[in-house]
Amino acid sequence: MSSEQEFEKPVIELRQKIADLRAFAMERDMDLSTEIKKMEARLSELEEEVYANLQPWERVQIARDHERPTTLDYVDVLFEDFLEMHGDRLFGDDKAIVGGIATYKGKPVTVIGHQRGKDTKENIVRYFGSPHPEGYRKALRLMKQAEKFKRPIICFIDTKGAYPGKAAEERGQSEAIARNLLEMAGLKVPTISIVIGEGGSGGALALGVADEIHMLENATYSVISPEGAAAILWKDAGKAKKAAESMRITAPDLYELGIIDSIIPEPRGGAQRNLHQQADEIDRLLEKALTRLAEKPVDVLLDERYEKFMKIGHIPEEAATTGQ
């Protein structure tokens, strides 16, 4: 079961009332189907009201849900014959990033993604989804292998950010991230990145220099967490909600800004409500995107990728002069 957020309380309470009424009807052998149907209709309306008008901070909470599907959850549903590969051939194997080769619709692909845990024990093993340099170097090794064998690359982004510890810095965290940005820009195969949860800072961008970038409806993508931004701007991490509203970190915001290519719909309440329904949405997008990119010559692919990232952050001159 996914964790319950404050804004979901009215929905959760009504669901519980319906469950209680069903149990009461069965226990007393009473026909309360009419009353239950009315309550279910109200529940549907209430879910629409709550989930169709989510605020940025509420989306942050959904993106952080500990039951939200991870990279490996999607790999299990979307791909066949997945063979996980380990190690960066320089230091070790970072379990905060998983990757390997797989089959998608009968064709070979390389799949890479951040991997967080779903409980404390697993999160410790996977560094809470925050990679060390060896994780990014493992990812790059797999990308270069994919380029060699002409396999498309599919990346799943889901991290609060790169691991901030002393050992990670000593082993070249910033260099590893920068190297990935450089190398991904020049990969001669189609690349697709999908933000499935949190997309935090350079730790996310190291898997995000792709031909197409897509986001799940309730995912976030930002240079810093709302708490971090609040601590810097107002010296108070408790103002994270205010920061989230100002940062434009949600999928609708980023689509409007031209940073992402599409928004992938989620089930009501988030991807954690129905893994297979969410995977179906991703599947439809992937099939179309891979077909679209496969038709492009390598030089066109590289030119369009370059132009895509050069446009990010660009403000048209007329907008700048009018203050818009």
From Swiss-Prot:
Which compartments is it annotated to reside in?
Cytoplasm
**One of this protein's GO BP terms?**
malonyl-CoA biosynthetic process
Oligomeric state and interaction partners are given as: Acetyl-CoA carboxylase is a heterohexamer composed of biotin carboxyl carrier protein (AccB), biotin carboxylase (AccC) and two subunits each of ACCase subunit alpha (AccA) and ACCase subunit beta (AccD).
Write the protein's name: Acetyl-coenzyme A carboxylase carboxyl transferase subunit alpha
Arranged from A to Z, the UniProt key words for this protein are:
ATP-binding, Cytoplasm, Fatty acid biosynthesis, Fatty acid metabolism, Lipid biosynthesis, Lipid metabolism, Nucleotide-binding, Transferase
Question: Which organism is this protein's natural source?
Answer: Shouchella clausii (strain KSM-K16)
Q: Enumerate the InterPro entries for this protein.
A: Acetyl_CoA_COase_a_su (IPR001095), ClpP/crotonase-like_dom_sf (IPR029045), COA_CT_C (IPR011763)
Q: In which pathway does it act?
A: Lipid metabolism; malonyl-CoA biosynthesis; malonyl-CoA from acetyl-CoA: step 1/1
Main subcellular location of this protein, as a coarse class: cytoplasm
Q: Which GO terms describe its cellular component?
A: acetyl-CoA carboxylase complex
Domain (CoA carboxyltransferase C-terminal) ranges: 42-296
Give an example GO molecular function.
Answer: ATP binding
